Amino acid sequence: MIIKLEPINDNNIDAVLSLSVREDQPFVAPNDVSLRQADEANAEDPGTARPFAIYADDHLVGFCMFAFAPKARDPEDRYWLWRFMIDKSEQDKGYGQAALAEIIRYFRENGADRLYLSTEPENERGLHVYHKAGFRETGTISEDEAVLMRMLKGPNKTIKEFYGINVNERLRIKRKKGYGVSIAVFDGEDLDTYCAGSGRFGRDFPVNPDMLFQAGSVSKPMFALTLLRYVDKGLIDLDADISGVVPEFIKKGPVTFAALLSHTAGFNLHGFPGYRADHEPLSLEDVLNGKGNTPKLRRIRPYGKQHMYSGGGYTLAELTFTRLTGVTLREAFQKEVAETLGLKRTGFFQPLDEELASNAAFGGRLAEKEDPAHGYHYYPEHAAAGLWTTPKELVKIGRALSKSYREGGLLRKETARRMMTPVMDSYGLGIQNLRGDIGYHDGWNEGFLTTWMFSLREDLCVAVMFNRSTDELDWKQSYIAIDLFQTAEEDLAEKPGKGRLKALCGKYEHPDDAEICVDEVFMQDGKLYAKFLGDDGEFTSQLYPIGKKTFGRKGGFSKLTFGKDCVTYNDLSCKKL
């Protein structure tokens, strides 16, 4: 059998358009759709799409289409088998496997070091063919399709990379029965997910994009969002004194929702450890009166004078909210947020519903230590720590908040802007505002870690959830989220030319009152760097573009804005020498 790939031309296009797959193979797009997409791609970037007819011994048997972008920065964007089909009358004759071998040879001869494709996870027949050809799942789900990759040079080892990041290596995910991670990224165009490891330590329970994780303190912005929906309806006043609603816990007012949400009311109880899943239910009053495993709520700092993170303050706010509205937070969130955004797997499920528990992650080794059937804790403090969700749905919420901030939507624009405006220490109403244009919150429940961040300038959001909680892994998974966010942010930005970058290079003055300042900007290996001087010494960071005159600092939440012969960093302007 001789397989030949022939470019689509006037002589074969009609025959290719007549090809089709079986009715039980709905995974493959019709060839006319594929060719139309090829025309659109090539109109924008000539040569990107390469459609071919597949011949076996000079007999037309199928169609394929490649995507070539060898100059793309991310290796995953360079070489793709975009479409592949064998006509229904020619299947089960070995043509598919033989054609894949010829396709692999074509890519290898044209300089590709690896080849990607994607297909629906339910496409068992296609996956069997791809696996036989050496393709393996990368762990990424893009637009509901599983991404597979085959190395074309060197050993055919699957590289578990997501946006160029080796997530498994950085989080030490080495076994399919070890700990697991779930990630979602919306990069302005597509929703991509990545899953690896097990949702339940020691068990064959692969993480999937719809698996529920506990979100820890990311519960707080979800409570704030719910409450602000009531503010927009005129049912709650953020600045009204609420001490009369909960007089047993506030002996002296005033206390407002705004102060509680911004952690400036001065209350204790930083966080909550949770209880075994089979623990008897506790009321919010029980928690605040110290009848659980945490001390009684009390004020330990002057009201409104400093930022002091307080899960106890959020629990007090939740109790006040339920007394004012007559509904539980679970009910209010479901109606105001989940139903509005079409969320199916996000809510204050305490305890977790049995129908949801079948696809829920366990936290750390709680199943081994406490309850084999329920490897997670019960959190009666819903607003502070009680949310269950998925990264995909966290991204949907982040995008809705970003849109609200930019133009209004789920919240009125002015309400969203107040939510994101720092009161003290970068913390607004339930959420941090980092760098002036990033909404951020992380979470830590027993056995669970979460990092969630979204842009206030554009449609970009990242969520990372992990079923293990240690100090080391906390910062590691946070930096994975930061790296993913900054990679997507850089991809969305206008790319400055080398001439423009070189014009920014040089030494900058050191203002006398500066705790930290830019000392020098320079080029290295075609990339822009800045050296900073501060009270703790000097350090160097790579810069990346986020706007026409603005650059972010890799690995950190700060930005540099260049003007005429000056640079502004942390609101401090340094003149170029």
State the predicted function of each range.
Residues R200, G253-E446, T450-T451:
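Short, surface-exposed loop or secondary-structure junction motifs
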Residues I2-S89, L100-E102, Y106, G139-E143, ...:
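Acetyl-CoA-dependent GNAT
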Residues F107-S118:
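Conserved GNAT acetyl-CoA-binding A-motif
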Residues L117-L127, E143-E145:
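Conserved beta-strand-loop-alpha-helix junction that forms the acyl-donor binding cleft
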Residues D92-R105, H128-K132:
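Conserved acetyl-CoA-binding loop-helix of GNAT-fold acetyltransferases
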Residues P155-G197, V327, E331-K335, E339, ...:
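Catalytic loop of the DD-peptidase/beta-lactamase superfamily, centered on the K-T-G motif
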Residues H131-T140:
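Conserved acetyl-CoA-binding loop of GNAT-fold acetyltransferases
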Residues R175-S182, G202-L260, R299-G312, H382-A385, ...:
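Short active-site loop at a secondary-structure junction
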